[in-house]
Each structure stands twice: as C-alpha cells, then as structure tokens.
Swiss-Prot record:
One of its GO terms (molecular function) is nicotinate-nucleotide adenylyltransferase activity. This is Probable nicotinate-nucleotide adenylyltransferase. The keyword NAD applies. It comes from Borreliella afzelii (strain PKo) (Borrelia afzelii). GO terms for biological process: NAD biosynthetic process.
Length: 193
C-alpha cells in the first residue's frame, strides 16, 4: 500500500489541507492518507484556547466523508515536543510493509537540513515536497520528490486572524469545521473586563 503522511497542527484544518491531500492522492497514486496532528511542534506555537481535542475533533469533521483519509494520534499519545523522525518511527511500526511518503511544504523544506536527523528522515521514507509559497523548486542535497500541485494561498494562522477580527471564513473551511469553531467559540478575541 502507498501511504502519505501529512503532519501539522491543523489549527484549524482548512480546505487547503484537504485540497493538497487530494492532489497528493492523485499525483502519487496514494492508497491511504494519514493526517497526524502534532502535540507540541518544534517550529510553531499552538496558541491559547484551542485544545488537542478541539483540533482532532475538527480533523474528524473535515475527513468524515473521505474514504482514503485517516487520523493517527501517535504524536498526541507520545506528548511533548514533536520531532518528525519520531513520528516516522511510530508510523513505520504500524505500516511495516507499506511504502511511506512524508509530505512537507516547500516553506518547511527550505530549512529541512536543520531538522532533527534529516538524513534518517530522507532515507526512511520518500520525502515529498509540495509547493506552498514558492513557485520554483528548491534545491537540496536530500533525496526528494517535488509534486506540481496547485497552491491554495491560505493558512491556518490567516484563518485564526480573520476569525479574531470578525472577517468571514466560510469559504476557507469545511462546513462542519466552521460550525464547530462557531459552536465552541474558538479563535475569537477574548475581551478583558
């Protein structure tokens, strides 16, 4: 089986994440896509007011009608700081005989050599680089596959900022995720009294 791994904070998951997963499924003939929400990523802050449960609930809602997309909570279970090499080790234990593809955006790939044990990552999975902010392909000494995906210019941080400032986001999120955010009052500015 050909399995793609997409790690991220998913704070919140948005249509860009789902669109990229569909592109990967098509372009690489993927059988299964695993979304792995990070517990405490090394390269960004999660932010206040949004729990791990909230992020997983939103992912479940976003993926509920996708028969090839699943959630793996190995980083959540392990807790603490999340390193990609540890995530891959966890996934490889579950999928010993499958071909694994780790998908990262070019924004992260540009600093891939500074990650914990990048050579082991690149040698233990097929490293797939997706366009996120750069139209040109970045060069690297690490073995990788570049996919020519379409860039959807949205980010979770932009969505959080739009919600906090009262701007519409309905076209950026799966409906169930939007409803969950509204029902749970997530990402709104807290007013001090």
């Amino acid at each position: 089986m050909r399995i793609a791994i997409l790690g991220g904070t998913y704070n919140p998951v948005h249509i860009g994440h789902i669109f990229l997963a569909k592109e990967i499924e098509y372009l690489l003939n993927i059988d299964k896509i695993i979304f792995i929400p990070t517990c405490n990523p090394t390269h960004k802050l999660i932010g206040e007011g949004v729990s791990v449960k909230n992020r997983i609930d939103m992912l479940k809602l976003a993926l509920k009608n996708e028969n090839k997309m699943f959630i793996d909570d190995c980083d959540i279970i392990n807790g603490g700081i999340t390193y990609t090499i540890d995530t891959i080790s966890c996934v490889k234990k579950k999928y010993k005989n499958d071909k694994l593809f780790l998908v990262i955006g070019d924004d992260l790939f540009q600093n891939f050599d500074s990650w914990k044990d990048p050579q082991s990552i690149a040698s233990s999975v097929d490293l797939v680089v997706a366009h996120r902010i750069y139209k040109e392909r970045l060069k690297s000494s690490f073995k990788h596959i570049y996919i020519d995906n379409k860039i959807i210019p949205i980010s979770s941080s932009e969505i959080r900022n739009r919600i906090a400032n009262g701007f519409p986001v309905s076209y950026l999120l799966p409906f169930g995720v939007l409803k969950y955010i509204k029902d749970n009052n997530l990402y709104v500015k807290k007013v001090n009294v």
